[in-house]
Amino acid sequence: MAEVEHQDTVNHRVLVSLKEAARIIGAQGMTIQKIRESSKVKIGISPHERGCSDRILSCSGSAQGVANAIGDVVEVLNQDDSEPETHSYKPLNFILPAPSATEIQDPESVKRIGNLRLIVSNSQVSSIIGTQGSRIKSLIEKHGVKVVASKNFLPDSQDRVVEIQGFPGAIASCLVDISEILAAEPKPSHEKQYYPHTKSQEEGSVTKDVAIPVEYVGALLGRGGNRVSSLRKYTKTKVIVSDEPDEENNRVFTITGNNQNSVKLAETMLLKNLETEKQRREDKV
């Protein structure tokens, strides 16, 4: 495990499948209790909600203790010799492919490489990536791991998955640095947190893309994202904005909801806000 010591309390959340959760808990809760005691952290897994295909592991304590505990979790999951699962719930499928024989010469070493799905708020993901990817590149080179962030938000939230692949000790060491990065960039209180998602919600979702000219995007988002956040709450939808403009210099607002009516309402409100902003600017001329 990493040797750096940090005493400030940190909290990390990890996305796990039902099968992974069972392995982490262990018979009569013995495995998770052992991790809890050896790392001196608070660690637990969310209740198994009916219809949900995932659970969330939460761990809090010192940066080093949390990193060690999560490294131990990766080690426990590596002991499963069965073939990797393919999940119908897409966020559970790993983004990174398994390491190839050309990357790791020793077959026994390959078995010790694991993957971690760290849940991070969207605003903090950019802090991990850094300017032009400089920070994420530094993490990869320093710790000998692979790190990638999901492009999409987790359903009904403003959280994304930061996936880390490597040896358990290397992942733990990387987590210490990530904890420092996140401590310097606190998560905004208004961002919606992810909770285990039911399969029926995912399968029955409705999505609509709305192209918005780049020059109006800031106005539609509002200060600190408050305008689009209000739209989300009122219509009970998820709204994701593309990072880069398309060839027509538009950014795409992707609206997702559990039914056609809520998505249509969000689309109508968004376009009405656009027309209002256009009119406001024309009146200024």
UniProtKB/Swiss-Prot annotation:
CDD domains according to UniProt: KH-I
GO biological-process terms attached to the record: chromatin organization; mRNA transport; regulation of translation
MF annotations from Gene Ontology: RNA binding
Domain KH, chain residue ranges per copy: 9-73, 113-178, 205-270
Subcellular location: Cytoplasm; Cytoplasm, P-body; Nucleus; Chromosome, Telomere
Pfam families for this protein: KH_1 (PF00013)
GO cellular component, one term: nucleus
Gene3D superfamilies documented for this protein: K Homology domain, type 1
Keywords: Chromatin regulator, Chromosome, Cytoplasm, mRNA transport, Nucleus, Repeat, RNA-binding, Telomere, Translation regulation, Transport
Protein's job: RNA-binding protein involved in the correct localization of transcripts in the cell. RNA localization is a widespread mechanism for achieving localized protein synthesis. Involved in structural and functional organization of telomeric chromatin and regulates silencing at the HMR locus.
Record family assignment: Belongs to the HEK2 family.
Complex formation: Binds RNA.
Protein name, per record: Heterogeneous nuclear rnp K-like protein 2
Top-level taxonomy: Eukaryota, Fungi, Dikarya, Ascomycota, Saccharomycotina
